[in-house]
Amino acid sequence: MNDVATIHATEREQARMGDLLELIPSRGESVLDIGARDGYLARLLADRFTRVVALDLVRPDVADPRVESVEGDATALNYADDAFECVVCAEVLEHIPEASLERACHEIIRVARHAIVIGVPYKQDLRYGQSKCQACGRINPPWGHLNVFDEHRLEALFGAVTPARFSFVGHNRDRTNAVSAGLMRFAGNPYGTYDQDEPCVHCGAKLQPPNGRTLVQKIATKAAYTIERVQQAFVTERANWIHARFDKVAERVGGGEP
């Protein structure tokens, strides 16, 4: 399990959080933080907004009287239309099953009155760092991420609102290829993201690394890494995250008067 306090203190995480805050209004009446987890961002937002609601699938435990913690689902938000001046949804959409993704984005647009700020991984290679569930035997994407995003996909998902700004944070060279990914699967995916908090996306069991590998599996693992090292010479570095600010314009969302 990850130590969230240690993660928040890292330079990488501080850069991500700082960039998000640049996109969020400097002051306002109300904000909804979807996927609040430990409430780190919600506490920062309490310095800017009169009302802060921290929402997650499990009610966040936020030790700040300025923050209202609630249990909720991004695909079915229990709030009226235009309920919040700003809605922030960071590190969430990549976890939502494809069949429910458009619904979640629709809900975000519906409850936002003015600003929407989204943060997701940028062009992530979901083959890199796969794990294998020891309970059901199925392959899991890294960190429980189910979707891949770039600016074009975000614009399509949030087509009812106006894109105001995109920003790109961090650096990433994590890439693999079909051959290496296949060899890793044969080897039992021994080096997947087993320290993640997210359970198996198929059966809900906690992910555990395999107990051991045969000699042939070890050879397959080494071959996979060798091919990836060769590939790295041709990999172009790109951002780790993409952040987007959308502004809700009444005429665009509702159509306005003819």
Predicted region positions:
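Feature marks short, surface-exposed loop/turn motifs that line or immediately flank catalytic pockets
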Residues: D61, Q124-L126, R175
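Conserved class I S-adenosyl-L-methionine
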Residues: V117-P141, H145
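A short SAM/SAH-binding and catalytic strip from SAM-dependent methyltransferases
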Residues: V88-A99
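A short glycine-rich, Lys/Arg-flanked "PGG" loop and its adjoining helix->strand segment in the class I
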Residues: E102-V117
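Hydrophobic anchor at the start of a short beta-strand
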Residues: V52, I116, V161-F166
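Conserved N-terminal segment of class I S-adenosyl-L-methionine
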Residues: M1-V88, E102-C105, Q134-G137, P141-N147, ...
